[in-house]
Amino acid sequence: MVKPENNLNQKKTKIGILGGTFDPAHKGHLEISKQAKKILELKNIIWAITKQNPFKNTSKTDLKNRIKFAKKIIGKNNFIKVKFYEEKVLSNKTIDLINYLNKDKKFEIYFIMGADNLINFHKWYKWKSIIKKCNLLVFDRQGYKAKSLKSVTYNGVNKNRLSFINFKKVNISSSQLRKI
Protein backbone atom coordinates (compact mmCIF):
# COMPACT_ATOMS: atom_id res chain seq x y z
CA MET A 1 0.00 0.00 0.00
CA VAL A 2 1.34 3.43 -0.97
CA LYS A 3 1.31 5.97 1.82
CA PRO A 4 0.30 9.51 0.91
CA GLU A 5 3.04 12.09 1.10
CA ASN A 6 2.81 14.79 3.72
CA ASN A 7 1.01 18.06 2.98
CA LEU A 8 3.63 19.43 0.57
CA ASN A 9 1.64 18.68 -2.57
CA GLN A 10 -1.81 19.40 -1.17
CA LYS A 11 -3.54 22.50 -2.42
CA LYS A 12 -4.25 25.10 0.25
CA THR A 13 -7.82 26.04 1.06
CA LYS A 14 -8.62 29.58 -0.04
CA ILE A 15 -10.32 31.68 2.64
CA GLY A 16 -11.15 35.34 3.06
CA ILE A 17 -11.04 37.48 6.17
CA LEU A 18 -13.20 40.56 6.48
CA GLY A 19 -12.29 42.23 9.75
CA GLY A 20 -13.95 45.06 11.58
CA THR A 21 -16.22 46.15 14.39
CA PHE A 22 -19.31 45.49 12.25
CA ASP A 23 -21.12 48.28 14.11
CA PRO A 24 -23.47 47.48 12.50
CA ALA A 25 -23.01 44.69 9.97
CA HIS A 26 -24.87 45.55 6.76
CA LYS A 27 -25.65 44.37 3.25
CA GLY A 28 -22.46 45.99 1.93
CA HIS A 29 -20.43 43.52 4.03
CA LEU A 30 -22.58 40.70 2.67
CA GLU A 31 -22.30 41.79 -0.96
CA ILE A 32 -18.51 42.17 -0.94
CA SER A 33 -18.28 38.76 0.75
CA LYS A 34 -20.39 37.21 -2.02
CA GLN A 35 -18.27 38.92 -4.69
CA ALA A 36 -15.00 37.84 -3.07
CA LYS A 37 -16.21 34.24 -2.87
CA LYS A 38 -17.27 34.29 -6.51
CA ILE A 39 -14.18 36.04 -7.93
CA LEU A 40 -11.58 34.05 -5.99
CA GLU A 41 -13.51 30.81 -5.44
CA LEU A 42 -13.05 31.09 -1.69
CA LYS A 43 -14.29 28.22 0.45
CA ASN A 44 -15.17 30.43 3.42
CA ILE A 45 -15.08 34.03 4.49
CA ILE A 46 -14.55 34.86 8.13
CA TRP A 47 -16.13 38.00 9.48
CA ALA A 48 -13.57 38.61 12.22
CA ILE A 49 -15.34 40.94 14.63
CA THR A 50 -13.16 43.06 16.88
CA LYS A 51 -14.16 44.69 20.16
CA GLN A 52 -12.62 47.98 19.12
CA ASN A 53 -11.10 49.46 15.97
CA PRO A 54 -7.86 51.15 17.13
CA PHE A 55 -8.41 53.98 14.63
CA LYS A 56 -11.98 54.84 15.64
CA ASN A 57 -14.00 55.88 18.67
CA THR A 58 -15.54 53.32 20.99
CA SER A 59 -18.14 51.06 19.38
CA LYS A 60 -21.71 52.10 20.08
CA THR A 61 -23.12 48.58 20.31
CA ASP A 62 -21.85 45.86 22.63
CA LEU A 63 -19.93 42.96 21.10
CA LYS A 64 -22.56 40.30 21.79
CA ASN A 65 -25.25 42.23 19.91
CA ARG A 66 -22.91 43.02 17.00
CA ILE A 67 -22.15 39.30 16.61
CA LYS A 68 -25.85 38.44 16.83
CA PHE A 69 -26.77 41.04 14.20
CA ALA A 70 -23.92 39.96 11.88
CA LYS A 71 -25.23 36.38 11.99
CA LYS A 72 -28.70 37.67 11.15
CA ILE A 73 -27.37 39.65 8.14
CA ILE A 74 -25.59 36.63 6.62
CA GLY A 75 -28.81 34.61 6.67
CA LYS A 76 -28.40 31.39 4.69
CA ASN A 77 -24.97 32.32 3.31
CA ASN A 78 -23.26 29.47 5.15
CA PHE A 79 -19.87 30.19 3.58
CA ILE A 80 -19.58 33.19 5.93
CA LYS A 81 -18.47 32.45 9.48
CA VAL A 82 -18.93 35.17 12.11
CA LYS A 83 -16.12 34.86 14.66
CA PHE A 84 -14.59 36.67 17.60
CA TYR A 85 -10.97 35.52 17.96
CA GLU A 86 -9.45 38.06 20.33
CA GLU A 87 -9.82 35.83 23.42
CA LYS A 88 -8.06 32.94 21.63
CA VAL A 89 -5.43 35.05 19.90
CA LEU A 90 -5.00 37.40 22.91
CA SER A 91 -4.71 40.32 20.50
CA ASN A 92 -6.80 42.51 18.22
CA LYS A 93 -3.96 42.88 15.70
CA THR A 94 -4.61 41.61 12.17
CA ILE A 95 -1.17 40.02 11.85
CA ASP A 96 -1.76 37.99 15.03
CA LEU A 97 -5.10 36.74 13.67
CA ILE A 98 -3.49 35.74 10.36
CA ASN A 99 -0.68 33.92 12.17
CA TYR A 100 -3.22 32.15 14.40
CA LEU A 101 -5.43 31.04 11.50
CA ASN A 102 -2.51 29.89 9.39
CA LYS A 103 -0.34 28.25 12.03
CA ASP A 104 -0.72 24.92 10.18
CA LYS A 105 -0.02 26.58 6.80
CA LYS A 106 -3.15 25.04 5.28
CA PHE A 107 -4.82 28.25 4.08
CA GLU A 108 -4.28 30.71 1.30
CA ILE A 109 -5.63 33.86 2.96
CA TYR A 110 -7.21 36.87 1.27
CA PHE A 111 -7.70 39.86 3.55
CA ILE A 112 -10.72 41.82 2.33
CA MET A 113 -11.08 45.56 2.84
CA GLY A 114 -12.63 48.69 1.41
CA ALA A 115 -10.54 51.24 -0.48
CA ASP A 116 -10.95 53.63 2.46
CA ASN A 117 -8.93 51.24 4.65
CA LEU A 118 -6.15 50.91 2.07
CA ILE A 119 -5.41 54.64 2.42
CA ASN A 120 -4.18 54.23 6.00
CA PHE A 121 -3.15 50.58 5.88
CA HIS A 122 0.51 51.58 6.25
CA LYS A 123 -0.38 52.69 9.82
CA TRP A 124 -1.54 49.20 10.80
CA TYR A 125 0.64 47.15 13.12
CA LYS A 126 3.14 45.14 11.01
CA TRP A 127 1.33 45.97 7.79
CA LYS A 128 4.18 44.73 5.59
CA SER A 129 4.07 41.35 7.34
CA ILE A 130 0.32 41.15 6.69
CA ILE A 131 0.93 41.61 2.97
CA LYS A 132 3.69 38.97 2.97
CA LYS A 133 1.37 36.43 4.61
CA CYS A 134 -1.81 37.05 2.66
CA ASN A 135 -3.21 38.74 -0.40
CA LEU A 136 -5.20 41.97 -0.15
CA LEU A 137 -8.54 42.15 -1.88
CA VAL A 138 -9.59 45.81 -1.98
CA PHE A 139 -13.13 46.80 -2.91
CA ASP A 140 -13.66 50.25 -4.33
CA ARG A 141 -15.87 52.63 -2.37
CA GLN A 142 -17.30 55.74 -3.92
CA GLY A 143 -14.92 58.66 -3.50
CA TYR A 144 -11.93 56.61 -2.30
CA LYS A 145 -10.38 54.98 -5.37
CA ALA A 146 -8.13 57.84 -6.53
CA LYS A 147 -6.83 58.50 -3.02
CA SER A 148 -6.24 54.81 -2.30
CA LEU A 149 -4.30 54.38 -5.56
CA LYS A 150 -1.96 57.16 -4.40
CA SER A 151 -1.55 55.70 -0.91
CA VAL A 152 1.74 54.68 0.71
CA THR A 153 0.47 51.11 0.85
CA TYR A 154 -0.55 50.86 -2.80
CA ASN A 155 2.70 52.37 -4.00
CA GLY A 156 4.81 50.23 -1.67
CA VAL A 157 3.27 46.82 -2.23
CA ASN A 158 3.91 44.08 -4.77
CA LYS A 159 0.87 44.37 -7.06
CA ASN A 160 0.75 40.56 -7.30
CA ARG A 161 -0.37 40.60 -3.65
CA LEU A 162 -3.16 43.14 -4.15
CA SER A 163 -6.32 43.01 -6.24
CA PHE A 164 -8.48 46.09 -6.65
CA ILE A 165 -12.15 45.33 -7.36
CA ASN A 166 -14.41 47.95 -8.90
CA PHE A 167 -17.61 47.56 -6.93
CA LYS A 168 -20.64 49.80 -7.23
CA LYS A 169 -23.37 47.55 -5.81
CA VAL A 170 -23.59 49.01 -2.31
CA ASN A 171 -22.29 52.35 -1.16
CA ILE A 172 -22.95 52.50 2.57
CA SER A 173 -20.74 52.32 5.62
CA SER A 174 -21.39 51.36 9.22
CA SER A 175 -20.53 54.95 10.18
CA GLN A 176 -23.25 56.28 7.88
CA LEU A 177 -25.78 53.78 9.23
CA ARG A 178 -25.08 54.83 12.83
CA LYS A 179 -25.97 58.42 11.89
CA ILE A 180 -29.43 57.39 10.69
UniProtKB/Swiss-Prot annotation:
Keyword Nucleotidyltransferase in record: yes
InterPro entries assigned: Cyt_trans-like, NadD/NMNAT, Rossmann-like_a/b/a_fold
Pfam families assigned to the protein according to its UniProt record, in alphabetical order: CTP_transf_like
Coiled-coil annotated spans: none
UniProt-recorded Gene Ontology molecular function terms: ATP binding; nicotinate-nucleotide adenylyltransferase activity
Keyword tags: ATP-binding, NAD, Nucleotide-binding, Nucleotidyltransferase, Pyridine nucleotide biosynthesis, Transferase
Lineage: superkingdom: Bacteria
Gene Ontology terms describing biological process: NAD biosynthetic process
SUPFAM superfamilies, per database record: Nucleotidylyl transferase (SSF52374)
Pathway: Cofactor biosynthesis; NAD(+) biosynthesis; deamido-NAD(+) from nicotinate D-ribonucleotide: step 1/1
Catalysed reactions, as listed in the record: nicotinate beta-D-ribonucleotide + ATP + H(+) = deamido-NAD(+) + diphosphate
NCBIfam families per record: cyt_tran_rel, nicotinate (nicotinamide) nucleotide adenylyltransferase
Record family assignment: Belongs to the NadD family.
PANTHER family per record: NICOTINATE-NUCLEOTIDE ADENYLYLTRANSFERASE-RELATED, PHOSPHOPANTETHEINE ADENYLYLTRANSFERASE
Functional summary from the UniProt entry: Catalyzes the reversible adenylation of nicotinate mononucleotide (NaMN) to nicotinic acid adenine dinucleotide (NaAD).
Protein name according to UniProt: Probable nicotinate-nucleotide adenylyltransferase
Organism per entry: Pelagibacter ubique (strain HTCC1062)
